[in-house]
């Protein structure tokens, strides 16, 4: 079963939901603001998506700007980054699509779905 991790008020996440439905792809929805990702889940997402840890940040989010993470994240350890991301779902890049054997984050999700 596929899992879409997103935020219900996010227009990009809504568009991905529509795309999944148009392609008749079944999925479970996980609200990132209510059901936070654990450190282990974040590590797995990073590894399976084959992305840099900094790509897990929602750099356009309000919380990201409020915390001044553009400059601060460079001085953080990997563990500090994972701890921070696991404490606030609004800091995590979305949407995230978990398939049987792959993970797609942010713009990768749309590219993947359009390729099907």
Regions found by a protein language model. Give the residues of each.
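Local sequence-structure signature of Cys/Sec-based thiol-disulfide redox active-site neighborhoods
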Residues: 1-19, 23, 28-32
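Thiol/selenol-based redox catalytic cores and closely related redox-interacting motifs
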Residues: 34-115
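Alpha-helix C-terminal capping segments
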Residues: 20, 115-116
């Amino acid at each position: 079963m596929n899992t879409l991790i997103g935020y219900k008020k996010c227009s990009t996440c809504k568009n991905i939901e529509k795309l999944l439905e148009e392609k008749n792809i079944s999925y479970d929805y996980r609200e990132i603001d209510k059901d936070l990702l654990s450190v282990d889940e974040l590590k797995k997402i990073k590894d399976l998506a084959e992305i840099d840890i900094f790509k897990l940040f929602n750099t356009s989010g309000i919380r990201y700007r409020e915390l001044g993470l553009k400059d601060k994240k460079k001085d953080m350890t990997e563990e500090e980054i994972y701890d921070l991301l696991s404490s606030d779902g609004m800091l995590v890049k979305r949407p995230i699509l978990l398939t049987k054997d792959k993970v797609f984050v942010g713009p990768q999700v749309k590219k993947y779905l359009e390729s099907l």
